[in-house]
């Protein structure tokens, strides 16, 4: 796949016979499929009207249907909230869900039976399924609920009761709950091991009614699944449940298809922007993955109100992707020195100092992309772009730092490597830039918070670094390449490749637990901010679960694109 070739970047390059380390990336698999999407404003407005109408029906039925003669069972209420979230509808009812969960938390925390004019709760009536859903939803939303509530499901020897193995629904719920664990929360580690072993046996029994749902969960638990992708799967599962709410189901289908229409329209605009840049022809050595990049961003924020945030982030991530290929797989060291200085200066007048011409091409497109972002922002919000620019400069400096290691033949220690590769992962830049276009980010408070490298920010970024290196290391080794975190860990600790990979995977598990703990109230930032970083982490399970799905676009990424951006749900 990789080779040393005699090449020049452009036909009119003055520099000839440069030996470049080039990598042959496969061409884009989508062609011009997303270039045009014809939907009229009238059709969109009609779809939006349908969704709004059903939204109010659901709001009244599910969230405001309580009265003195209609006492709601807590377990049933939690099941409804769980369904709303699994169907991808929670963004419509955030305040209602918060109010319901707050009330449920208050009446269940004391672990005593409770009945008032609206709610009925009995600790004695709760089975494993009920307790697991209550635990998962409350912890997911930051309520301080102890995992000790699962102690009652253990026997005298301290192990989970054998009788639970026959409660398949309960075990599946406990399995999902275990992924909300904190660091050193042993009971949830035990729960995960117990449920995984037994659920695998059920998953193999294709005739079991829950086998499909169990297989999905074992492959990717709810905590690590993108909201939209899970909604796509769960709509068909929910429809088969005899007790499903028909209005809620119809609302979920219409909402999914409406958002898909909005996203397809957005992607067509982005695809045309990308095609007009013509970088596929001007810089043919770089990966051409605009659709996959949009999928990445869609995982971070899919809600319609974040269209501007997506538009800004797609331009930043596409520029970073091309830069990554210049620094990692094409540019000479001397060229990289020039490009680094140019980006740090951020001044179009520096373009005349750039050579060969491919650097000029990239630099002009790079600066223009950020100018476009500035124009898209309201005047009073443009100060936020400063943070995006500074984070991009840091990314470029990290790319160059790694190029220096390669040029000098330096093999860094694991700790030294992580200081630089933490930034070169691209995630610090992407996370910071994601907040630039979010209109509910009104001040610089979020950016100042990020500058302190809070725990959730560090955990997410390190996960991205480790997951990338774990799957891309062998491909990168086919050419002269800077050592990965795996290589550096092996050298620093004198362990085998398998031992190093096992340790990094173990750290990823613990970093997920740190992310979970950062949602515990009171939080350092509003949950609307923390959720974006959580979503950045979730996307990694799509991109890197089965290899480097960005560089080598495989079935998992293709299927995800099809599910979210091609195939509507039949009504």
From Swiss-Prot:
User: Which co-factor is required?
Assistant: Mg(2+); Mn(2+)
What does the entry list as the binding residues for Mg(2+) 3? 468, 472, 476
Q: What is known of its domains?
A: The Asp-Asp-Xaa-Xaa-Asp/Glu (DDXXD/E) motif is important for the catalytic activity, presumably through binding to Mg(2+).
Per UniProt, Mg(2+) 2 binds at: 324, 328
Entry protein name = Germacrene B synthase TPS16CC
Q: Origin organism of this chain?
A: Cannabis sativa (Hemp)
Family, as annotated: Belongs to the terpene synthase family. Tpsb subfamily.
Keyword entries, A-Z: Lyase, Magnesium, Metal-binding
For the biological process aspect of GO, one term held by this record is: diterpenoid biosynthetic process
Q: Name one Pfam family in it.
A: Terpene_synth
Entry comment describing in which tissues the protein is expressed: Highly expressed in glandular trichomes.
Q: What does this protein do?
A: Involved in sesquiterpene olefins biosynthesis, constituants of cannabinoids and terpenoids-rich resins. Catalyzes mainly the conversion of (2E)-farnesyl diphosphate to germacrene B, which is spontaneously converted to gamma-elemene as a thermal degradation product.
The organism's superkingdom is given as Eukaryota
Q: Which InterPro entries match?
A: Isoprenoid_synthase_dom_sf, Terpene_cyclase-like_1_C, Terpene_cyclase_plant_C1, Terpene_synth_N, Terpene_synth_N_sf, Terpene_synthase-like, Terpene_synthase_metal-bd, Terpenoid_cyclase/PrenylTrfase
EC number(s) recorded for this UniProt protein: 4.2.3.71
Biochemical pathway: Secondary metabolite biosynthesis; terpenoid biosynthesis
Q: GO terms for molecular function, please? A: magnesium ion binding; terpene synthase activity
- Record: residues binding (2E,6E)-farnesyl diphosphate: 287, 324, 328, 465, 468
Free-text remark on how the cofactor is bound:
Binds 3 Mg(2+) or Mn(2+) ions per subunit.
UniProt xrefs under CDD domains: Terpene_cyclase_plant_C1
Q: Does the keyword Magnesium apply?
A: yes
Give the residues the record marks as binding Mg(2+) 1.
Answer: 324, 328
UniProt short sequence motif DDXXD motif, positions renumbered to this chain: 324-328
Tell me which SUPFAM superfamilies the record gives: Terpenoid cyclases/Protein prenyltransferases, Terpenoid synthases
Q: Which reaction does it catalyse?
A: (2E,6E)-farnesyl diphosphate = (1E,4E)-germacrene B + diphosphate
Query: What does UniProt list as this organism's lineage?
Result: Eukaryota, Viridiplantae, Streptophyta, Embryophyta, Tracheophyta
